[in-house]
Amino acid sequence: MPCPTGVTRCSAGVSSLARCLHTCPVLEGVTKANLSKLRKKTGFTFVNCRKALEKFENDLEQAEKWLKEQAQKEGWAKATKLQDRQTAQGLVGVAQEGTMATMVEVNCETDFVARNPKFRQLVTQVAMATLGDVKAHPQWTLGWLKALHTGEELKQLQIGDTTLGDLTALTIGTLGENIQIRRAMYYSVPPIPTKHVGVYVHAPVAGTTGGQSGSCALGKYGALVAFRRKNTEFQNFNAAELGRRLGQHVVGMSPLTVGEMPEVREEEGEKKDGDKQDEEERSTDSDEDETQMLRQTFLLDPTMTVGEMTRQQGIELLDFVRFECGEVEES
């Protein structure tokens, strides 16, 4: 029996209304805008972002929270599954504020992931969290501080309402590679005008800065250097630049100890040309295997040793630390 005309019209009207609601530019625009925002903010796939928005009726805040919770759960599961995979790549991060600094190493499996913004963000968060940990313990900064912390210790560090361990799991869930927080060096000298901490990062990642108070820099190599200003009469004293140059030497020449100051050289005018040449050859031979920093030829000026450079600048080298991403530590 055919349907009454009115019913047919009603069905057609409902279908038209459904089509109107489905294609309405305002509603469709809101969905697309939120989908784009959520995708850009979280980095998750469009499929997962749409699923989250549908689940919470386009509520961005709730959708983002749910996505992160799911990624973190998946990340912890992946972390357990991938924990035996080798992590030889990664980045070194250096954060500094005044006479306090921290240097961290976070590893991943491939250089491709090491260049990913999400991984860089994690390394920055680890570096800033460790610096915050130093600042949270004022008693540590009253004297000399040099403490190496393991990845297992660092995972427990709180950052906001989460931990570094949870952040790492979240990043593993997003990027799909084994990621390990390997180590962190806490470093500080007494906050007095004559003592300084210098920082240097080699092969820095574009868009990161280092060497300024409150900054964080990322790269493949890093160095922290502690030194004391002995002669306050020197003009144009630039502690940050001196620290950067000393750190560059540490990264490039890989000294093992500070060592002892070399003896003051004789005046060049008192030597014959032949004697000068012989001494230069002997100096070159010995410098190749020299591990005491003060006795090494200064990387940025081969005409002098590091010791002579510090004497010239009126400073005393106290200590240094060098990190190389992926290096094998001697047992």
Swiss-Prot record:
InterPro entries: EF-Ts_dimer_sf, Transl_elong_EFTs/EF1B, Transl_elong_EFTs/EF1B_dimer, Transl_elong_Ts_CS, UBA-like_sf
GO biological process, one term: mitochondrial translational elongation
Family: Belongs to the EF-Ts family.
Record field: compositional bias (Acidic residues): 276-291
UniProt protein name: Elongation factor Ts, mitochondrial
Record keyword Nucleotide-binding present: no
Cited CDD domains: UBA_EF-Ts
Keyword hit for Mitochondrion: yes
Membrane-spanning ranges: none
Alphabetical list of HAMAP family matching this protein: EF_Ts
Subcellular location: Mitochondrion
PANTHER family given in the database record: ELONGATION FACTOR TS, ELONGATION FACTOR TS, MITOCHONDRIAL
Region (Disordered): 254-295
Gene Ontology terms for molecular function: translation elongation factor activity
Primary site of residence: mitochondrion
SUPFAM superfamilies noted in UniProt: Elongation factor Ts (EF-Ts), dimerisation domain, UBA-like
Biological role stated in the UniProt entry: Associates with the EF-Tu.GDP complex and induces the exchange of GDP to GTP. It remains bound to the aminoacyl-tRNA.EF-Tu.GTP complex up to the GTP hydrolysis stage on the ribosome.
